[in-house]
Amino acid sequence: AARFAFDQILSNGACGAAMVAAMVMYMSSDPYDYSLSEPDKPAKAIDSGLYIVATPIGNLADMSQRAIDMLRAADLIAVEDSRVTGKLLHHLGLKKRMRPYHDHSSEADRDALLAVARDGVVVLVSDAGTPLISDPGYKLVRAAREAGIAVSTAPGASAVIAALSISGLPTDRFLFAGFLPSKAKA
């Protein structure tokens, strides 16, 4: 809706430029406010629990409506890097509370997420692709299941499957043993 509004404003020439300036004045000065001044669309009601949501691996438009609805309904989003997830939330026009969850997160961090998931909606995302694939989120999922907290997913992009699908190799059997290191070892 915001993109359509900007397109309409820009097509009106000089008058449109004044309207854009007025809209910029209404944008929040809060560095964690990733939305324009218009409120989020109402979230679809979903049950409390932990939701594993895949994020795009290169094109921000590659996200399912169900995944967007889960993000919209989230009380808290567990993220690897708030800067990366912030870009996605901005693209979607959402303003949400985020909490870091990564390799260096403590048991106390995990317990804090579970406390919210007992009565609210916690969404776990990775920087790109499906959480828990070469990712520390499995500890959170295991702890949620042990605590009797519902766990669900909105599947989507996976770098492993995307690479396999364009490799030309047979796809009926394959082994994933982790991603190649990003830096050569000395």
Enumerate the predicted regions with their spans.
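Class I SAM-dependent methyltransferase SAM-binding "motif I" and its flanking Rossmann-like core
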Residues: 139-186
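Short, acidic/turn-prone active-site loops that include or flank metal/cofactor-
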Residues: 82-83, 100-107, 157-158, 178-183
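Aromatic (phenylalanine/tyrosine) cluster motif
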Residues: 4-6, 26
